[in-house]
């Protein structure tokens, strides 16, 4: 059993039927140089072989009885690969737009909290001997960087072994969860003096910053944006759209402007949203 961090608990609490807290990672792979056939069956076989070294994939949320403690991770949960590994077909003609529509549908459904919080989709039907792998992983299981690393490890097909996860699944007993919760509460009590001290220091810091903001009212305006067609009430459905930027050109421009690649891509995206908003307002 493993303790969830405070941030993880916040992410769980902030999830609603309309606001999902999973992240998507997408890899489009050209399989023309592969030895053998890059099939769903092969993908499933490789994934199963890698599971022993993909530790977070075995984590499952367990609620503490009567909510006496925050949820905890059970670290050796049983996996139903028929649920976690899905096969999807990209409709003809199998281009980027069609793949985007499939990704949007995948993003629109929340992960099942009664199972380990991840799924991978193997998308077939793309043009040019390509396949796509779409990973859906909850933020409490892995952040964006960790999710990308997990995705990369699942795509290393060439050196996969036949190692299987050992041990039989045995769900945690209630008394074990309660014992863990009690020990953790005792450990938290020991840190109470420092927590109170940090809280007092933080309160004074917030008060000081509030006074500073009063002398710069223009800063507060940035956190109160005007209403647009985008920032309204959400529904569960998601629409996904992608664009292609030449990496060499992006690197050259970012070097010329002495900014990071992230700075440049975010600026391009913000500019595109501004243009789109203007078009919608005008129509």
Predicted regions and their residues:
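Long, Pro/Ser/Thr-rich low-complexity/intrinsically disordered regulatory tracts in eukaryotic proteins
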Residues: 6-7, 11, 16-17, 22
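Soluble acyl-CoA-dependent acyltransferase catalytic core bearing the H(X)4D motif
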Residues: 1-7, 24-39, 44-283
